[in-house]
């Protein structure tokens, strides 16, 4: 299972850059999801993390296809309701395109529109969406049975829930507050990374 870390749009550029650089070796992908920041601020963030040695192949630009193209980042995440994957692929066929979905119908539609994968959530109740009940691992399982592209699960992901998500068929997990709201982001990322490695080891036995 892949481990995706998603920025939470709550930190100044310099602090966020330090966290990203610190956790880069513990995660598979880092999604830049800074919706309140200007293009100039996001470009400054990218400059800082490139200087810090981040592997550009690990970066996913959420929503800002323009910045991805300008910065030669080849992975983009399209929010629900934005451009369709098919529209983006027609113009920029080199991009690897994810689509955020919240239902079985949206997941099926994303596959039809040529998304490379879907980000489904929120699976469990989460601090990011307080008061909203999670959509559950049962729906996650239903989606996996209906589509053939990878499904990344997001929402309320904690290390002790990863087995349930794996059993439902998820190809990876995405974590926002569990890492970026932690007082110790590196140790938080390591807890997820260790749990995933432990699960892979058990499967190999």
UniProtKB/Swiss-Prot annotation:
Pfam family, one: TMP-TENI
UniProt xrefs under InterPro entries: Aldolase_TIM (IPR013785), ThiamineP_synth_sf (IPR036206), ThiamineP_synth_TenI (IPR022998)
Gene Ontology BP annotations: thiamine biosynthetic process; thiamine diphosphate biosynthetic process
Source superkingdom: Bacteria
Induction: Strongly repressed by thiamine.
Catalytic activity: 2-[(2R,5Z)-2-carboxy-4-methylthiazol-5(2H)-ylidene]ethyl phosphate = 2-(2-carboxy-4-methylthiazol-5-yl)ethyl phosphate
Keyword Isomerase: yes
EC nos: 5.3.99.10
Similarity comment: Belongs to the thiazole tautomerase family.
Protein known as: Thiazole tautomerase
Origin species: Bacillus subtilis (strain 168)
High-level lineage: Bacteria, Bacillati, Bacillota, Bacilli, Bacillales
């Amino acid at each position: 299972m892949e481990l995706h870390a998603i920025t939470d749009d709550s930190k100044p550029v310099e602090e966020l850059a330090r966290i990203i650089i610190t956790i880069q070796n513990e995660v598979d992908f880092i999604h830049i999801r800074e919706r309140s920041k200007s293009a100039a601020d996001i470009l400054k963030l990218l400059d800082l993390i490139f200087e810090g040695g981040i592997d550009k192949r690990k970066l996913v630009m959420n929503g800002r296809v323009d910045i991805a193209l300008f910065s030669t980042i080849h992975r983009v995440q399209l929010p629900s309701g934005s451009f369709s994957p098919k529209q983006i692929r027609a113009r920029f066929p080199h991009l690897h395109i994810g689509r955020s979905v919240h239902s079985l119908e949206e997941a099926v539609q994303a596959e039809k529109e040529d998304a490379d994968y879907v980000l489904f959530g929120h699976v469990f109740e989460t601090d990011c969406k307080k008061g909203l009940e999670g959509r559950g691992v049962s729906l996650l399982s239903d989606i996996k049975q209906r589509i053939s592209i990878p499904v990344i699960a997001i929402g309320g992901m904690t290390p002790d829930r990863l087995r349930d998500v794996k059993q439902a068929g998820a190809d990876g997990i995405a974590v926002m507050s569990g890492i970026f709201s932690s007082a110790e982001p590196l140790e938080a990322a390591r807890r997820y990374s260790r749990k995933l490695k432990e699960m892979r080891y058990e499967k190999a036995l």
